[in-house]
Amino acid sequence: MNTMENVFTNATQYKTKKLLTFISSLLIILGVVLSFTVWFFAKPVISKSIDIPDGFSVQGVSLNQTSSYIDFDNLANNNINFIYMRTTYGDSSMDSGYKSSLSRAKSAHLKVGTIHVYDASVTAAAQSQYYIDNVGNSIGELPIAISVTSDQISTATSKQRLASLVQTLISHYDHDVIIYTTPAIQKKLSSTIKNTKYWLIEDNTKDTSSKNLFIQYDEDHTIGTGLKAIKMPTTVFNGTQKQFEVYK
């Protein structure tokens, strides 16, 4: 009987020891998993400053009405010096969030420029007045940009209307105006608009002609890393840091 009891006791002790070992191992594994989970979600987001293309010292981004909420401080921390915001279209559409975005961009110490989208079906007077009425003096520091697509300059009249819009805004604000467009459209406008500089839409930074004040080199560039990474059209200023600082 004693022998049977000893066998039973030893078996029980073995099972108990095995169970305790299993539980201990399980607790250790759970502890490791829990520690990793806490570290993963609590660790700071690391932002990596994006490089500026060789030969340039200033770069920025552009946003429009379809852009989601933008963390301007994150942009500033990633070698972004300026931002262009789409404000008006023709004489019928205004980005209602522009002035709020302008305020936040200034708080992040970014220089700001506005984008007006040209509509050839509307007179230059109507478009300029719509811009003046809605944007007012909140035009930022950078030249006013007029976005032009190929379908809006198909006639001589549409080109002349654009030229008139440029001059009207320059006269009203005593402020530079540039045309935001592609090399092909720039060529088509060369005989009509001769003294206005351009913001060229490209996929590289090769055309550093003095007529190109800005060059958009990537329309979907990744800025930052991790949870704060964002893709935006990215542009370089075709000049020196000192020349850029003139815009105040």
Regions found by a protein language model. Name each.
Residues 2, 50, 55-60, 68, ...:
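Functionally critical loop-and-helix segments that line ligand-binding/catalytic clefts
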Residues 46-48, 53-68, 87-164, 171-172:
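Substrate-binding cleft of extracellular glycoside hydrolase catalytic domains
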Residues 143-209:
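Catalytic domains of cell-wall/extracellular-matrix polysaccharide-remodeling enzymes
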Residues 21-43:
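Hydrophobic membrane-insertion alpha-helices, especially the h-region
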Residues 58-60, 81-82, 111-113, 141-145, ...:
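Structural preference for beta-strand elements that scaffold enzyme active sites
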Residues 1-19:
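N-terminal Lys/Arg-rich, disordered targeting/topogenic segments
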